[in-house]
């Protein structure tokens, strides 16, 4: 006969929703078998009880056998073979129904006993195991719930031991009960065939014995058919016995192997933490807020599917989307005095979930898995190898290198295969300066023991006025474009360039140099290494607004400006050469009251887009600002030239007016002189007028030369 559908006993300890769904199918099949066998039992019982109704009962039996093919068994894998067999039985029984007599003893032994035994023993055993399993499952859920509520701050060894022992006992009981329940359901598939065929075989044998003299109704073909059925029943029984023995052995092996797993927090030395996972599944407690200060915790089955975190409640056929974890952030948190809690925040910061793992191993594996998925490692050809390589790079970044060259070759693609002098050829416009920079020590770039700031200072902090002063006045004093003081707000609003990017702040630290991109690379390495050492996963998300005047970090929820970086103070910016989502820039500000005391701070960010786009946007803003400044200078120069020309024009007009007045005065003097005056008087008047005219002419020439 075809293969028998079986429940996987090996998956009973995991107790996943898929296993529970498959169990529901088997339970539905057992219910269908029970209903059908009850009808068949009633039909055969009528044969046994009532001699007078034997014919009618036989006819009903034949009818039920014919209707077997119309039954819908969820696990009816061999319906065609069984239907054809029962159809043939139905025909024979229908032919013999008119001449059957009551043979109560033979029918009781050969027909009623097997089906009664199946009904009273096997089916009741299934019902009993189902009830026991349900009780064990409820006890296990209650024990897990009590264990999850253990206080981390007020830890009591006695209470913890009792709760842990309770979890161990309930989990062991549930596992053992579930394995035996699965075994009984698997065995039921064999017993179903036996319970169907063996009573029929006994019934026919009783009829053969009764009608031994009626050989005309019992030909050789029928005997051959019955013999084949008997052989099939024996084969099914032997197969069942072998399978039962195998399942019992599997149960024993699993009980021994699964004993350490009954503990909710297994020994980490025996079960090491795998940090290279890109897929994970298991039960987690999810925190759901029910009010302003109240919340509930629901235990659900969570699993990752690509870049999505899925959840599935017990009894559901399939899981549903819980959160998109691409580009998300995950970190361990303390929540309601519960252990092993972690928080997942979506890439846009609008959705977050707090989950609780069952053990420390699950807690760290979930955080590492979600962190790997957030980096989209699962999209590569070999996700686990890529995750292992990334984690190994993080560990190497934490380990100090003996030289500056070795520290930065790990950050450059193909850096290990190039000779040490290859860096000087890729320096671009820096020329020979990169050769000198390669020989510098680490202290020449970043001061030793420099503190790292992992969070953004709020605008309402006490340091903000001084910081604004450093960014504002200090930036204008060192402005390379020569901008004059003015309203920053109006300049930002009138800016030609407005580009907005979503970034997450990784950290900032003071640097000692700001003339080479290696400063940014080294700062990235130290900040990432510090985050890895201290297990800092939280990042502050902001909107980075790039304009022609400044860079602004804006709170995405309140739209409040967190920090403002004047564009002239941004003297250097670069992108990580391997992880293009990482970028940073160096800000040169006034470090104190003295304008000559300047300090440089390097800020590192992670973006959803490529960091090169943000750096290109900053470069474009600087170019636009430079051209705007050049245009402003040219405009001011042109205005100055026009003012000089206008002044000269006014002087010339004034000179012409003076000359015109002199000429008019001369005409008046000439007209007023009399021709009959004495020569001396005429000479005196003429000499006086000439002297006055000459004085005025000299004065006009002097003014003209001055103009």
From Swiss-Prot:
GO BP terms: adiponectin-activated signaling pathway; cellular response to hepatocyte growth factor stimulus; insulin receptor signaling pathway; maintenance of synapse structure; negative regulation of Fc-gamma receptor signaling pathway involved in phagocytosis; positive regulation of cytokine production involved in inflammatory response; positive regulation of D-glucose import; positive regulation of macropinocytosis
Biased composition (Basic and acidic residues): 636-666, 698-707
Domain notes: Overexpression of an N-terminal domain (residues 1-319) or a C-terminal region (residues 273-707) has a proapoptotic effect. The F&H motif, an approximately 12-13 amino-acid sequence centered around Phe and His residues, is essential for binding to OCRL and INPP5B.
Ranges of residues in domain BAR: 3-268
Subunit note: Homodimer. Binds RAB5A/Rab5 through an N-terminal domain. This interaction is essential for its recruitment to endosomal membranes as well as its role in cell proliferation. Binds DCC and the catalytic domain of the inactive form of AKT2 through its PID domain. Binds PIK3CA and subunits of the NuRD/MeCP1 complex. Interacts with OCRL and INPP5B. Interacts with NTRK2. Interacts with APPL2; interaction is independent of follicle stimulating hormone stimulation; interaction is decreased by adiponectin in a time-dependent manner. Forms a complex with APPL2 and RUVBL2.
Compartments, as annotated in UniProt: Early endosome membrane; Nucleus; Cytoplasm; Endosome
UniProt source species: Mus musculus (Mouse)
Modified residues (Phosphothreonine): 399
GO CC terms of this entry: actin cytoskeleton; cytosol; early endosome; early endosome membrane; early phagosome; endosome; endosome membrane; glutamatergic synapse
This protein's name: DCC-interacting protein 13-alpha
């Amino acid at each position: 006969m075809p293969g028998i559908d079986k429940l996987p006993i090996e998956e009973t300890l995991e107790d996943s929703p898929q296993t529970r769904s498959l169990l529901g199918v088997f339970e539905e099949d057992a219910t269908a078998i029970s209903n059908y066998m009850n009808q068949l039992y009633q039909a055969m019982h009528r044969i046994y009880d009532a001699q007078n109704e034997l014919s009618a009962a036989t006819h009903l039996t034949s009818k039920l056998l014919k209707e077997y093919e119309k039954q819908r068994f969820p696990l009816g894998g061999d319906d065609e073979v069984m239907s054809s067999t029962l159809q043939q039985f139905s025909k024979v029984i229908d032919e013999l129904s008119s001449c059957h007599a009551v043979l109560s003893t033979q029918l009781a032994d050969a027909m009623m006993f097997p089906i009664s035994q199946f009904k009273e023993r096997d089916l009741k055993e299934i019902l009993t195991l189902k009830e026991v399993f349900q009780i064990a499952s409820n006890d296990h859920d209650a024990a897990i719930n009590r264990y999850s509520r253990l206080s981390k701050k007020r830890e009591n060894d006695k209470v913890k031991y009792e709760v842990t022992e309770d979890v161990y006992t309930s989990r062991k009981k549930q596992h053992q009960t579930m394995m035996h329940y699965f075994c009984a359901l698997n065995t039921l598939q064999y017993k179903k065939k036996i319970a169907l065929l063996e009573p029929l075989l006994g019934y026919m044998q009783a009829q053969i014995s009764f009608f031994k003299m009626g050989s005309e109704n019992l030909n050789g073909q029928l005997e051959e058919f019955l013999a084949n059925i008997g052989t099939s029943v024996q084969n099914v029984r032997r197969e069942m016995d072998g399978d039962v023995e195998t399942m019992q052995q599997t149960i024993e092996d699993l009980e021994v192997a699964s004993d350490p797993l009954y503990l909710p927090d297994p020994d980490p030395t025996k079960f090491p933490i795998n940090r290279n996972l890109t897929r994970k599944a298991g039960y987690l407690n999810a925190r759901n807020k029910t009010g302003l200060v109240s919340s509930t915790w629901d235990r659900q089955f969570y699993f990752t599917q690509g870049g999505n975190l899925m959840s599935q409640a017990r009894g559901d056929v399939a899981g549903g989307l819980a959160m998109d974890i691409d580009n998300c952030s995950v970190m361990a948190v303390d929540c309601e005095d519960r252990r092993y809690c972690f928080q997942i925040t979506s890439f846009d910061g609008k959705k977050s979930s707090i989950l609780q793992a069952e053990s420390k191993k699950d807690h760290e594996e979930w955080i590492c898995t979600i962190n790997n998925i957030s980096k989209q490692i699962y999209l590569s050809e070999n996700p686990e190898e890529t995750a292992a390589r990334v984690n190994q790079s993080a560990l190497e970044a934490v380990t100090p290198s003996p030289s500056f060259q070795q520290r930065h070759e790990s950050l450059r693609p193909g850096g290990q295969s190039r000779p040490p002098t290859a860096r000087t050829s890729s320096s671009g416009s820096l020329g020979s300066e990169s050769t000198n920079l390669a020989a510098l020590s680490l202290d020449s770039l970043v001061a030793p023991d420099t503190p790292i700031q992992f969070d953004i200072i709020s605008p309402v902090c006490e340091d903000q006025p001084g910081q604004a002063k450093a960014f504002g006045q200090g930036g204008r004093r060192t402005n390379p474009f020569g901008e004059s003081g003015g309203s920053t707000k109006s300049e930002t609003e009138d800016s030609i360039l407005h580009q907005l990017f979503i970034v997450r702040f990784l950290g900032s630290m003071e640097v000692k140099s700001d003339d080479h991109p290696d400063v940014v690379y080294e700062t990235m390495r130290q900040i990432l290494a510090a985050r890895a050492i201290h297990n800092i996963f939280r990042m502050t998300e902001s909107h980075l607004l790039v304009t022609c005047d400044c860079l602004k970090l804006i709170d995405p929820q309140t739209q409040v400006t967190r920090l403002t970086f004047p564009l002239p103070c941004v003297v250097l910016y670069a992108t990580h050469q391997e992880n293009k989502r990482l970028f940073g820039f160096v800000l040169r500000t006034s470090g104190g009251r003295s304008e000559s005391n300047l300090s440089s701070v390097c800020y590192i960010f992670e973006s959803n887009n490529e960091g090169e786009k943000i750096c290109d946007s900053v470069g474009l803003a600087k170019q636009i600002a430079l051209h705007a400044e050049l245009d402003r200078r040219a405009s001011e120069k042109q205005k100055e030239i026009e003012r000089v020309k206008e002044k000269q024009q006014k002087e010339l007009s004034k000179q012409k007016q003076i000359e015109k007045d002199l000429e008019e005065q001369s005409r008046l003097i000439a007209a007023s002189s009399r021709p009959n005056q004495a020569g001396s008087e005429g000479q005196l008047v003429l000499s006086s007028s000439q002297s006055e005219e000459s004085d005025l002419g000299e004065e006009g020439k002097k003014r003209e030369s001055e103009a």
